Amino acid sequence: EEKELEFFQTSESSSSTFCKINYNSKYFKRKKKILSFFNKNEYIVKSELIKLKTLENEFTRLNLKYADILKIDTEGFEFDVIKGARNKLKYIKFILFEHHYDQMIIKNYKFGQINDYLTQLNFKRIIKFKMPFRKTFEYIYINKELE
């Protein structure tokens, strides 16, 4: 089933997201101050409805049997992407994703929920890396069935 969701295009595309922005967060205020030297536009430039596709459906459509690595960088929408893979996760060896702890992106989940979900599906966290200058970490999980 395809559904539509509002996508927010930011003035600097690396932060475009399906999630709402917390304009009162300390991180947003600091980021906006720095970006204002280069870009005088509003932070959210436009929004539009986007048809979502799930990884489960794309695996089927493309007739994929497995994936060595799934890299997810969706600015607060990572858990939705992972859940959208459903029963195809068992065919993915590594999952790499980032998680923001800075409160700028309003997410509908916490990191512990992703960790619990992947752990229940036989994934194990093998790497946690803090990104410089912000409260964001990258995580790599391995599928223990495919180790």
Regions found by a protein language model. Name each.
Residues E1-E147:
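Phosphate/nucleotide-binding beta-alpha loop and adjacent structural elements of enzyme active sites
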